[in-house]
Amino acid sequence: MLADPSVMEFYPSPKSREESQAWIDWNKRNYSEHGYGLWIIETKAAEFVGDCGLTWQAVNGRPELEVGYHVRAEMQGRGYATEAAAACRDFARDVLQAVHLVAIIHPDNTASRRVAQKIGLEFEEDDRAGMNDVRSVYGARLRYAQAVPLCVRDEEAHRGE
């Protein structure tokens, strides 16, 4: 899948066998260090669809938890990426107690942007430190940090009491 030019259209190039092995090794390290990473996506009939999961990425020099996904070309457009990304978002929020989640997307990748938007991520900023010249960062606050005080609703603050 990572060697397929249509799947890797928005990457600098498809991955070679060696690059794919390095990517697998990176995923193994993620599991060792964090306890999570990318998961395999399969149909109910156990047909391989792609991968989706959570990894730490640098966005403009700061660490961000990213939901990422790859789907085999012939399986694209069927909702698999959206379903898997939503499950990852929920895992990040409910299990990892993550406060913020991002998706880092090539500006021309409209399908990936749609997936991000369908799971509640909105454009936040451009990242100029990635492997492409510019990457679009979509994100969402999953929960509020406990250190942030609750805000008073506007009408309550201006009652004149």
Predicted ranges, named:
Residues M1-F10, D25, L38-E161:
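Acyl-donor (CoA/ACP) binding surface of acyl/acetyltransferases
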Residues S16-G35:
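Active-site rim helix/loop that mediates acceptor-substrate recognition in acyltransferases
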